[in-house]
């Protein structure tokens, strides 16, 4: 069964604790932490996400899924390692190609699962050489930087391509889809080969978190 990683990006600070408890009861698999630096993308969420991680570190055992939408990847990786995340994902587009393997090795050496992410316009072929070494490939199904966007239909073919490549080369990375995911389109994304669905607005904006998570799966 597909895993659900609930994004906390759209949760207001004064509601974070109550929301976390409700999401625990609703059986979310991960808390998805969208870290933005104001450079790689326009929004800057770093301070708020650090604060959320501190809350989560004290009150929940649900694993953290850290998604770094930042230019200075190494610096931000170090900031979030203290929270013992399950997954740390960085963007292919944020690094020079010769730096990517070093970053993959660094995150692995810290005992974390490592993910590489691509924007909607990035060709899957750009990251093929790194796929044997990562645990997760995150496909942005919207433009990174803000929640509540509509899924870009053409990104589903990237999930299909990654799934086919995984099967043909006997690899075991998980495919994570992030952006514009809701009950109405989740089946199509799962059928394309996704293993983890990131959803924020679809869950947080619903009346019944557990029912929405169940329907997304």
Regions found by a protein language model. Give the residues of each.
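Catalytic cores of alpha/beta
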Residues: 18-21, 72-82, 122-134, 179-197
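Structural motif
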Residues: 26, 59, 83, 110, ...
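Glycine-rich, proline-tolerant flexible connector loops at the mouths of alpha/beta enzymes
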Residues: 31-50, 142-148
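Glycine/small-residue-rich loop that forms an oxyanion/phosphate-binding "nest" at active or ligand-binding sites
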Residues: 33, 45-103, 116
